[in-house]
Regions:
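Extended hydrophobic/Leu-rich segments
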Residues: 8-11, 115
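Signature of the catalytic double-stranded beta-helix
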Residues: 110-123
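Bacterial N-terminal signal peptides
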Residues: 1-8
């Protein structure tokens, strides 16, 4: 539980320190994550008595892979997107997205924040990280049935930069595109499958284009999300207002986790209502997928260790945090 220790700013202070901020995300206007960050903004506006005002741009300003750089350069004051849209820019945070068997968004969100707070990677020093969150267990969603590993051979799968390695390891062909392109890619037959949590089936309407969701709990991955602010804009805020930002952001971390898990449940019901199937791989089949995916983890460790970073320690830490959060 987060207990408020920062009183709302006085009306006089609000008049004196009025600040307008642009917030950009790749999510669509009606997506649950968009609605949640808009509530975040309203809460900050309320607690600062209007000293801060937000203008939101959901899915209509910057693409997901442009948002981080947009925050750094000041094209947007605040942005929410995923680390995996920017190749090799976030070698430390990349450890979060490895196929390590996340059971829920609650666990994944706890892990990513604890991991960040432990390492404070320099790769994020050019922004102010307000908070992080992560979706529920990622799985494969396909147009054709997939019951065994061999069914993936030659299949074109919409992937992020990070999940493209998993796609290759399983014998399929990655097509690296942001989430917003997935519906049309599936509709046009350019890809036969995509990665994502169950949420994408309803939140992005992908249940209209796929027939099967394949769940292997041993390689359930997540995608790490950042909410980052331009450093110059952050430093221009008064200490009191910065305190409000940090307090509200801390309160919103579990809200995102709950929203992700609830949207997974709703999407499960939705896709089944359309006649789609959820294929749960048995332990023997799932073990084969896990063995095939292991090189993704091994290659990450080798690549990042070469740059002088303790990648094996990162992976070990993530595994420990998953186990701890899942208890």
């Amino acid at each position: 539980m987060v207990i408020s220790v920062i009183p709302a700013l006085s009306a006089g202070a609000a008049e004196k320190q009025s600040t307008d901020l642009i917030y950009t995300t790749f999510f669509t206007p009606k997506h649950g994550q968009t609605l949640l960050v808009e509530e975040w903004g309203k809460e900050i506006e309320k607690r600062t008595n209007g000293a801060v005002h937000f203008t939101f741009h959901p899915g209509d300003y910057l693409q997901g892979d442009q948002i981080y750089e947009g925050v750094v350069l000041g094209a947007t004051d605040i942005g929410m997107s995923v680390f995996s849209y920017n190749i090799k820019r976030f070698p430390v945070m990349e450890a979060i997205d490895l196929p390590l068997g996340y059971p829920s968004a609650k666990v994944a969100t706890s892990v990513i924040n604890d991991f960040y707070n432990k390492y404070h990677p320099k790769e994020l020093d050019n922004v102010k990280i307000l908070y992080l969150h992560a979706h529920g267990p990622g799985m494969l969603h396909s147009k054709a049935p997939v019951y065994k590993l061999e069914d993936l051979k030659g299949m074109r799968i919409r992937s992020t930069v990070f999940t493209s390695a998993l796609t290759k390891a399983l014998g399929a062909i990655p097509v690296v595109k942001p989430q917003g392109f997935t519906y049309v890619l599936l509709q046009d037959g350019y890809v036969g499958a995509t990665w994502g949590p169950l949420e994408v089936l309803k939140g992005w309407r992908l249940a209209e284009q796929i027939k099967y969701s394949i769940w292997c709990k041993r390689i359930g991955y997540t995608t790490g999300f950042y909410v980052a602010m331009n450093l110059k804009k952050w430093n221009a805020l008064t200490k009191d207002i910065q305190g409000v930002f940090e307090e509200v952001s801390a309160e919103w971390i579990p809200k995102h986790a709950v929203a992700w898990d609830e949207s997974d449940k709703a999407a499960r019901e939705y896709t089944l209502s359309l006649g789609n199937k959820i294929v749960v791989l048995d332990d023997e089949k799932c073990s084969r997928w896990q063995q095939a995916a292991q090189p993704v983890i091994d290659n990450y460790e080798k690549r990042v260790e070469k740059s002088g970073l303790p990648a094996k320690e990162y992976v070990s830490t993530v595994k420990e945090l998953i186990q701890k959060a899942a208890q």
